[in-house]
Amino acid sequence: ETGIKLANLFSLNDLITFDGDLGVGKTFLCKSIINNLTTINEVVSPTFNIVQTYPLQKDEEIWHCDFYRINNFEEVEEIGVFEDLKKKIILLEWPKFNFELGEYHPLNINIEIKKNNRSSLSELRKISLSGSKKWDNKIKNLHNFLAL
């Protein structure tokens, strides 16, 4: 449900970063967003390929990236992730280079497992959103919608 609500906020030229511990649900949330923005049924984790692309319309794409194994920003530039951003939505896990990403005005999504969770069947997550002024209205609307 959260992925559906998030997907409705995103448009071309958006960079969304996902941060949190291993196994917290970053890839799961990204897959949910991609499933809701495309007709793709099988979304593959970019853990080993670093980037997976999914078509939207015409020459527009969603880029799902995992920077866990990236060592420096030069490697990011070699891949071309930020080239022609106006034709992309970028979902980026493990944003190690936040200081380099400022010019792209990312929406930062941090996911944590809630402590003292009483549910034995599933773990609850805490999602925190932050970003530049570009995201202020969308974050406010999303907070109200999700009651974050």
Model-derived features with residue positions:
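Phosphate-binding P-loop
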Residues: 6-13
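Hydrophobic anchor at the beta1->P-loop junction of P-loop NTPases
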Residues: 16-18
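Conserved lysine of the Walker
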Residues: 26
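The conserved Walker
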Residues: 22
